[in-house]
Amino acid sequence: MPIFKEYTDFDAVGIAELIKSKKIQPIDALDTAIELIEKLDPTLNFMHQKTYHFAMESLNRNKELNGPFAGVPMLMKDMDSALYSVPMMQGSNYLKNIPMKFNNSLSKKFTNSGALICGKSATPEFGLMITTEPTAFKPTRNPWDTERSTGGSSGGAGSAVASRAVPIAHASDGGGSIRIPAAACGTVGLKPTRGRISFSPSHGDKWGGLTHSGILSRTVRDTAFMYNELFSQEIGDPYSVHYDKGTLINALDKNKKYKIGFNTDTRIPVSISDEAKNAVRFNAKICEDLGHEVEEVKIEYDGLLLSRAFVIIISSHVSQMFNELKDLVGRTYKKREVENASRMFDYLGKSFRGSDYTWARYTIQKISREVMQQTNDYDAVIMPIISQSAPLLGELRPKKSAELINDIVMTLRLGSLFRNHSIRDKLLNKLAPDSLWFAPDALLQNVTGQPSISMPTYYTDKDMPLGVQIAARYADEETLIDLASQIEKASPWINKKPNVS
């Protein structure tokens, strides 16, 4: 039996309150988390590295239990989370056994909050897939059905939080990677506004401003309290988004009435399942019953154009990432060390010209403006984040046709063909639906930079969670926390536990 047997009944704020009131000792929570990790991880594979020593050292240094999350166990994602002397493997054999030489800004903020970092959670290689099935590690499994995916790229965090091994975990989101695992695993996942959380000291932004750091949690209040600690800029950051301390905590009890739109469609040429549409309508009905003004809204944009621009930006940054990693590792990667899809992104990025990248940036900025103008009359918009409940493991891995194209292009060195816009567009038009079918509109708020939250309010006939996303205006997480808190009280999920927990 766990040392603190009620551990899984409490969220992170609840555990912190028990520790502060001396009803439990911080070592009790840490030992219980370690026991649960050791019990659950062999089945779920949500861990890439264990850092129990790091957690214990933090606890020994923080004898006064400073910070709102003092003594609360958590995980850091194995990306965007530099811990001194701990490798950041990013799901790749290429980076195994390469210790980091610094603590980044985000890991310092988590440590300053008092949270105890017990390990590095699983991620697909370099965060490039929306399923957490890297070839360097065992696939991460969904605790609701272990034959199914957790989504990605923060799938390890989603599985760990949903299974209640830890109440809170770091996540990051470059195209849905906070909200997709939240929706698939049944957790709360809020992607913040662009620029809220610094990537200092190593980067100004990631993926041209598309990537955002954040967390997964089990409750809205955990999200509000932790982001209250994380929201701040560092000197030299490329974006500045002011935050008044305490705003999100105060928003938990505002209970304002809002004008809310809902949309069940997508402009990416893929299908949204009936169950995903039902999930949107279910959440819209909750909002209507709460007294909010709710109406359907159509959002028009060129989905294929957006997906092409998205791939160009990502692949360009992946190529630059490999340049940086070469300096870190001391050599170029070997073919067997890096997955085919990752090498394809690298090769694509090297084939694009500066004008291609500029076109892609202008394109997403244009579409961002169009989307924000169409939705600006609404305080929040509800839309699908995933097109169905979690698919079986393997279904979100690259299709064989895509793998074959990868091999041909890289073997014959045909990357220059992508400089021909006609050939490039035809190929990307074919590949985009294959890569985006599970989460077609996940990237929309990465493009606009707006905050967006997913919550586990809806469950399918097979008792699988199927979250939706609710987006707000730029820099308005306050509205999302208020609305999400209202929805959580009207349709609570805290007592729903997955099969493996």
Task: Label the model's feature ranges.
Residues 1-57, 285, 289-290, 462, ...:
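An N-terminal boundary/leader segment
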Residues 2-3, 69-90, 252-263, 316-372, ...:
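Short helix-loop capping/hinge segments that flank enzyme active sites or metal/cofactor-binding pockets
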Residues 23-31, 60, 274-298, 326-330, ...:
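Acyltransferase
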Residues 55-57, 62-136:
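Acidic/His- and Gly-rich active-site-bordering loop/insert found
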Residues 102-234, 450-458, 462-467:
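Short glycine/serine-rich loop segments
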Residues 191-284, 301, 491-501:
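A short helix-breaking turn/cap at a secondary-structure junction
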Residues 417-418, 480-501:
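Short, gly/Ser/Thr-rich active-site loops of penicillin-recognizing serine hydrolases
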